[in-house]
């Protein structure tokens, strides 16, 4: 068993989630509120270590009305235990789970255990299937994925995403080195593409929101 997973992201019309320099201010204010409402509805929010290192995010509910107990559990996929101990994801605003691999340096793991629940899953890299199974065992039934390109790819190709919700902003940035919604090795044949079914689409301010379910 694993949690129900909703991949949520904001991208430009040309599919970029950040520029080549890392600038990622894409969503309008209305969409940011939508994101925080979704956070409030989920038991956990998952990001990868690259997102943590780039943004030092809080991963809490703070753009809509929320009680302290409304903050989801923060989950970081961090194979080598690189999360800096002073980063905000380890503050006391909400519980945090760090998923590491067996290859993570023991001294880093020990330091993280002082501030978070550490789950060892996988030998060299975090085994996402095993991590999600462990999270479900901890009572997490609904998880919001706010991953970067690499984590999104791994979760989607692993069959671990149930819904995809995307804010498409009326911007075009281009750039061969700019991050796309999903990267990774990619799929060779279009016939093997991950198929989605559109459930809803609507506008929020200038942004277009599309919501899909992932076909089995």
UniProtKB/Swiss-Prot annotation:
Top-rank taxon: Archaea
Entry EC no(s): 1.1.1.302
Intrachain S-S bonds: none
Keyword list, A-Z: NADP, Oxidoreductase, Riboflavin biosynthesis
NCBIfam families reported in the protein's UniProt record: rib_reduct_arch (TIGR01508), ribD_Cterm (TIGR00227)
Functional pathway: Cofactor biosynthesis; riboflavin biosynthesis
UniProt KW NADP keyword: yes
Quaternary structure note: Homodimer.
Organism: Methanothermobacter thermautotrophicus (strain ATCC 29096 / DSM 1053 / JCM 10044 / NBRC 100330 / Delta H)
MF terms in GO: 5-amino-6-(5-phosphoribosylamino)uracil reductase activity; NADP binding
An individual GO BP term: riboflavin biosynthetic process
Protein name (database record): 2,5-diamino-6-ribosylamino-4(3H)-pyrimidinone 5'-phosphate reductase
Recorded catalytic activity of this chain's protein: 2,5-diamino-6-(1-D-ribitylamino)pyrimidin-4(3H)-one 5'-phosphate + NADP(+) = 2,5-diamino-6-(1-D-ribosylamino)pyrimidin-4(3H)-one 5'-phosphate + NADPH + H(+); 2,5-diamino-6-(1-D-ribitylamino)pyrimidin-4(3H)-one 5'-phosphate + NAD(+) = 2,5-diamino-6-(1-D-ribosylamino)pyrimidin-4(3H)-one 5'-phosphate + NADH + H(+)
Family in the record: Belongs to the HTP reductase family.
Cited function: Catalyzes an early step in riboflavin biosynthesis, the NADPH-dependent reduction of the ribose side chain of 2,5-diamino-6-ribosylamino-4(3H)-pyrimidinone 5'-phosphate, yielding 2,5-diamino-6-ribitylamino-4(3H)-pyrimidinone 5'-phosphate.
Residues binding NADP(+), per UniProt: 51, 55, 79-82, 126, 148-151
């Amino acid at each position: 068993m694993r949690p129900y997973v909703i991949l949520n992201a904001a991208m430009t019309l040309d599919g970029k989630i950040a520029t080549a320099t890392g600038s990622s201010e894409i969503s309008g204010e209305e969409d940011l509120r939508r994101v925080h409402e979704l956070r409030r509805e989920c038991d956990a929010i998952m990001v990868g270590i690259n997102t943590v290192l780039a943004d030092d995010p809080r991963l809490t509910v703070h753009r809509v009305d929320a009680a302290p107990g409304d903050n989801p559990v923060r989950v970081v996929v961090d194979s080598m235990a690189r999360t800096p101990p002073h980063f905000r994801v380890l503050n006391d605003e909400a519980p945090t789970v760090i998923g590491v691999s067996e290859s993570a340096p023991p001294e880093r793991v020990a330091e993280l255990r002082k501030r978070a629940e550490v789950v060892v899953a996988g030998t060299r890299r975090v085994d996402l299937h095993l991590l999600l199974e462990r999270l479900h065992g901890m009572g997490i039934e609904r998880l919001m994925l706010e991953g970067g390109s690499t984590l999104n790819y791994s979760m989607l190709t692993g069959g671990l995403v149930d819904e995809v919700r995307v804010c498409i902003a009326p911007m075009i940035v281009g750039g061969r080195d700019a991050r796309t919604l999903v990267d990774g090795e990619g799929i060779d044949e279009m016939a093997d593409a991950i198929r989605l079914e559109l459930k809803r689409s609507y506008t929020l301010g200038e942004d277009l929101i599309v919501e899909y379910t992932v076909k089995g």
